Amino acid sequence: MIVLSLFDGMSCGQIAFDKLGIRFDGVNNKYFASEIKKHAIKVTKNNYPNTIHIGDVTKVSYKNGTLYTENGEYEVGEIDYLIGGSPCQDFSVAKLNNVKYGLEGDKSKLFYEYLRLLREINPKYFLLENVRMEEESKKTIR
């Protein structure tokens, strides 16, 4: 099984797979993680040492079974799962300063990177999670 996790954070995706009894050994089952926060990467490396860290999502692409990243190229064949939760600060209904940029905000526009890779990869399964948001952002996503 091949999993690509975007905005991986501390690898909550692997926690969920773990609870299902699925482990990533880096050989038969591979978990590729795109994350840029150093502390989150450190937590993942400690808890899931077989994770393949691929860096910044904006520098990831996929073509003909190859995953191209800032940390190298990987012959992966088909990707089974694309998972992730793009940054939400710009469109969350809980925005504290009451300024909402929607999906055009500096952080939340990374949603489009998820969408780009979803189209490139066409995985068997995908999961995009996020927060409760304003109606305008919901319309854009639909």
Task: Please tell me what each predicted stretch does.
Residues 1-142:
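Conserved active-site and SAM-binding loop architecture
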